[in-house]
Amino acid sequence: MSFPEEKKMKKLPKYRQIVHFIKEKIGNGEWPIGSKIPSQRTLAKDFQVNRSTVITALEELMADGLIEGTMGKGTVVINNTWTLMAKNSAPDWDQYVTSGIQMPSRKIVQEINQSESNTDLIQLSKGELSAEIFPLAVMKEMMGKVSQHMEAFGYEEPKGYLPLREALSNYLKTIGINVSSSSILIVSGALQALQLISMGLLQRGSTVYLDQPSYLYSLHVFQSAGMKLTGLPMDNEGLLPENVHLTRGERGRAILYTNPCFHNPTGILMSKKRREEILAVSENTQLPIIEDDIYRELWIDEIPPYPIKTIDKNGHVLYIGSLSKTLSPGLRIGWIVGPEPVIERLSDIKMQTDYGSSSLSQRVAAEWFTSGHYQQHVEKVRQQLKVRRELALSALETHLKEVATWNIPKGGFFVWIKILPSISMKLLYTKALSKGILINLGSIYAQEKGNYIRLSYAYASLEDLQKGIYELGLMIKELASR
């Protein structure tokens, strides 16, 4: 739309602006036939009008034969300006988008993902460091250094930028993992590591054993590749390995995923003894392990036990690390450590997928490690997280003591809060969102028993953190009194 047209549109009544907006989306092919249009609530919020204005606009579009409201399905596009005049209809894109290999996220997860970018909301569950902690000045310095020395901006070798892999090899030695750069693959975040494993190492019908609850249940990485998830119970020391019982058919068709340091979502830190027990089960059953250790550096009270990979002498463990939680998710830099044949296989798949992670990001990451700034940064992050954790725990004690219980995490981002069983969690989620607070319910992580919330003390400003917990306490008490 040109600037004069934009000015003209702003002079129209609000309902006409909504009509024009929807017609433009349909006419441009952005919302093809079968597409579900935004809800009345969303449109009212976006255009800053009441719902009656939105209803007026939708009624006009229905009269024009462009949209149709169906009970239980919302309002969908049934025609476009071409098909009203032409004999040939557009492809049924709705059928296509429901036929892809990748399974869609649950509706509540999609809503959370969209809402996490809304700066008007208090993000009480977001698993990311606050902008208040982000080292902007040092990041600019690192990027400046990298840009001065770059002679080209092409693809890197399949396993990733060699100086970064060499820097990671040195870094990993500090936590007891002795590997060469040839056993390290650079990936675009830990999630891509899991996707590569699902595509390259497991066949359809394989079993993925994992902690339950788990962050993995909010995704469909393995299920979309035709695998099934089998949850294993946890206690306060982590996953209970005695519950791993491989059938004869699962040997060679199963893998164990675990998140031992400051587990997402429970915050549990796996004990040294439990790590040894899990590796023993792995060795006895020939069950490979995926060790997702992205929160390791975020310890607050004491240094965590060494990774399982440290005591793995026979190549049973694939170790995943990342800068997304400790430095910046925007860099999209993570790594997998494993036996060389596995790394060769995964690097080949990665090349077929995206031809390598960002060259610029890899160079910036290498600069963080080789300059010594990374270790200085994570020490500051730990100090900030300690302040935030104490603030959150104090606010919880003040405002939720009567209606909830929780753990005290030794590091990471999360407090796992158990709410009174009488509370409707769906109603609490909706009520919180209407008051400008976004929370992640335990159900999205396959927490089957009890009412849980994953609370993050890492992202919201200190003021919003206190305000959000205060409001959450009021809402829970109100629902409990009904």
Curated annotation (Swiss-Prot):
Residues 12-80 form the HTH gntR-type domain. Pfam families: Aminotran_1_2, GntR. This is Uncharacterized HTH-type transcriptional regulator YdfD. PANTHER family: HTH-TYPE TRANSCRIPTIONAL REGULATORY PROTEIN GABR (PTHR46577), TRANSCRIPTIONAL REGULATORY PROTEIN (PTHR46577:SF2). It comes from the Bacteria. Keywords: Aminotransferase, DNA-binding, Pyridoxal phosphate, Transcription, Transcription regulation, Transferase. The modification N6-(pyridoxal phosphate)lysine is found at K325. Transmembrane segments: none annotated. Its cofactor is pyridoxal 5'-phosphate. Residues 40-59 bind DNA. One of its GO terms (biological process) is biosynthetic process. Signal peptide: none annotated. One of its GO terms (molecular function) is transaminase activity. In the C-terminal section; belongs to the class-I pyridoxal-phosphate-dependent aminotransferase family.
